[in-house]
């Protein structure tokens, strides 16, 4: 940014708004990450905390408690085709984010028409009289708006994807998570760390980079043979730093 003529203050603001996106399944971890990012930005721009800068660090949220009956009130002033399209797409997003706290960023969100969905959710017609059906409509709008932001971040492709994945073997997964990874990540299903490797590759744009702190089980175990084959066939490994100190006998090359 400085080479392009930006001041440090403007560069910090632009990086927050255009270059950094973060997702976490845990609300507390999100808060810590948000704080760390904002404090780093403030090091270069003391005005960064004035509320005018958007920081794209989010905690993944579930759609379980959304009152879907409220969808019929949304899209006021839009034509029927737009309303029907938006409603189908919102329903699709809500379906995807059901139990999202169980799955986190391994959920695959479709690339919807986000501008259309934002217009749909922001306009509502609950009639002149308040009814039981429309009670809590504004809360529903706020919740769906938050899910749109998170969903768009999850659907995007990035130049660089960096993560420290969870290390959890299949025996430690609950039934819901285990069934999900078997269905959606069959080659990497034996450990959440390798599931996250596959997901990171999906989130990375063509020619992009991923960097992970991972355990080396995927390099040697036969259960990852197809995963390794696909990884080497479709991608280029630039560098691997392997420490043998903490590798147990069953996974040592």
Model regions and ranges:
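Class I S-adenosyl-L-methionine-dependent methyltransferase module
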Residues: 1-156, 160
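Signature of N6-adenine DNA methyltransferases within the class I
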Residues: 25, 30, 34-55, 59, ...
């Amino acid at each position: 940014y400085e080479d392009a003529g930006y001041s440090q203050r403007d560069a910090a603001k632009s990086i927050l708004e255009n270059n950094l996106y973060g997702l976490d399944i845990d609300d507390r971890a999100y808060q810590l990450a948000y704080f760390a990012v904002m404090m780093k930005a403030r090091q270069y721009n003391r005005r960064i905390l004035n509320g005018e800068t958007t920081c794209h660090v989010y905690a993944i949220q579930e759609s379980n408690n959304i009152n879907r009956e409220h969808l019929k009130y949304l899209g006021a002033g839009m034509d029927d085709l737009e309303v029907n399209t938006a409603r189908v797409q919102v329903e699709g997003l809500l379906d995807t984010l059901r139990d999202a706290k169980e799955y986190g960023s391994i959920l695959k969100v479709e690339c919807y028409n986000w501008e259309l969905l934002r217009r749909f959710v922001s306009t509502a017609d609950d009639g002149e009289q308040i009814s039981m059906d429309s009670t809590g409509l504004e809360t529903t709008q706020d919740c769906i708006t938050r899910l749109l932001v998170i969903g768009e971040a999850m659907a995007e492709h990035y130049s660089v994807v960096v993560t420290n994945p969870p290390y959890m073997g299949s025996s430690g997964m609950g039934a819901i998570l285990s069934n999900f990874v078997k269905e959606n990540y069959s080659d990497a299903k034996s450990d959440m760390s390798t599931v996250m490797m596959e997901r990171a590759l999906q989130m990375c744009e063509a020619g992009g980079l991923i960097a992970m702190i991972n355990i080396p089980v995927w390099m040697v175990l036969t259960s990852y043979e197809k995963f390794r084959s696909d990884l080497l066939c479709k991608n280029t490994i630039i560098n691997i730093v392997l420490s043998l100190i903490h590798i147990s006998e069953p996974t040592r090359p």
